[in-house]
């Protein structure tokens, strides 16, 4: 059947016109989509990304394939994403937060290149603000944190928040390019970085990406274990399906770098579609990221890692490989703990929804590793369960940090919380410790403060009388500026010094070097009774030093009791009691002058027995006459338990040991002439005692000492001013004489 030429010509012209109209409509759609992307990129503060189609012949520049694979790739094209503009980060941002931005503009259905109506969806956008770290960290975060209120205001959009993703990337021991295979790729493939198939209940909320570059050769030494997969009804990539995976190489290069590394990952290859951009096994998608300026502002360092570069996940991330970090989410996000992940959706649900790649705008920023990064001083406060983590970096820490890379995906609901002031924590701990010490000192010195009128008294204006518990800031300033004299340090006991040292040690161990603090470990507290007394005791400084030395052995209670009794007796506060004691001692001593020691002991024992037996017979006769039964006359004294506990014996033995050791050391020092002047003084004293011994015996000297003990304190208390004046004159003359002697004796001029 012959066709009419005119009809065929008309039909051909109609088809050509229809094809031109269709092509014009597609060009208008492309221009509208490109204009929409440019407007949205400008609104979000992103740089536009150009999409180019180029041949794989140029891949040899980037070392993508070897010579064998290059022969099979001739003539093929791939998608090339590039950005020829450097994104200048905001220098005033130090904390980075992000949340998915909502689409506010109504776009034409033609822009979506998909069938069916499409409501505005949350399109994940990325914004980098000050993401330049000294340790070569690269972070990608969504836009300003102020968008949180807008995103969470809609309860429907609240249901779309998705779990955080955390991927830990290790460094190869040989520091070379290597292929990294994700062990759990088949089961956890839906948790990859480029999942771009959000549903009505789930969508990506925010993404934080951090990379690290090789510290030694300037190359990327870490690879991202993920694969982006093509989809029939979707432009670029979509969630994985159950189809058989195939290999598709992915290359990430940095402009300005001499070489680039490549890593191949398994991926799913589906049937081709004429809608959108999609890679095939023959296409090689390449992402080129521009290097920022060297004077980029510093950023937060990545989370603290251990020696092998492992970053500790937070929250429920410890329970599974890709968990949900809910520490920084507000209450609305916490309610979504049971939200299903992308992997739980069926293939039908994934294929029934379409995501439009024309509405995505990504900005990838990377930091440049230079020698100046070694001097970084930035630190990060890793938020999570209110835990403060301050990281101080040094040369070694920077080199160890270069051995690892990491990638984190997290929801951030707002600005990170500011870390608590370390000085306040230290002040609270110090205040509690000093309050405990002060309470113990008050209890121990309570009895000694009311023992007698001559007890040491503190000046009310003295710094030690001020309350130990004060305002935190005032106490911190006082602890760093207050100073003590040497005499105050000498009067402190060893026990208090030990307690104060433990206090400072606990404070230092709690902070772990997180902040510099001026710790003064030589500022112990002092007990009340250990201050130098305002009024001298009758026995002078030597007696005071002995009493203070007995404090750590006998304890406060025995010392206080005996000290009170001795003061009452020596100052004749109770005349009757003092008279009985003084008379008994003198009687015994005078008896020793007339009789031997054995005779004196025997006579004293017979006298005591005569008195007690006589009193016992007298009471018995009296009870028989009066026909009463009062019992034993000494029953009350017999009921008193007279025994020394083990603790008391140890205390008295310790006191005796202290005096014995002191005397032995002093005699050794004098007889072995450790100090020539002191040895000469001791020799003069012994020479004078020879004359005293010729005139008086030991008992006479002992009687004179007892009389002096019970008389001199009263006389000194009454005529203290005059006695001090004469004692000062005597001391001055003695010092002059000793100085003259030292000047004449060789070898003694160096002594003070």
UniProtKB/Swiss-Prot annotation:
Residues 264-273, 363-383 have a biased composition (Polar residues). Residues 566-752 form the Reticulon domain. Its main location: endoplasmic reticulum. It is a multi-pass membrane protein. One of its GO terms (cellular component) is nucleus. One of its GO terms (biological process) is brain development. Residues 1-57, 264-319, 334-424, 444-465 are annotated as: Disordered. InterPro entries: Reticulon, RTN1-4. Isoform A and isoform C are both expressed in the animal hemisphere (presumptive neural ectoderm) of blastula and gastrula stage embryos, and along the anterior neural border, in the panplacodal primordium, and in the dorsolateral side of archenteron roof of late neurula embryos. At the tailbud stage, expression of the isoforms begin to differ. Isoform A localizes to the cranial placodes including the trigeminal placode, lateral line placode, olfactory placode and otic vesicle. PROSITE patterns: RETICULON. Induction: Isoform A is repressed by thyroid hormone. Residues 334-361 have a biased composition (Basic and acidic residues). The keyword Repeat does not apply. The chain crosses the membrane at residues 580-600, 684-704. Keywords: Endoplasmic reticulum, Membrane, Nucleus, Transmembrane, Transmembrane helix. This is Reticulon-1-B. It comes from Xenopus laevis. The lineage of its organism: Eukaryota, Metazoa, Chordata, Craniata, Vertebrata.
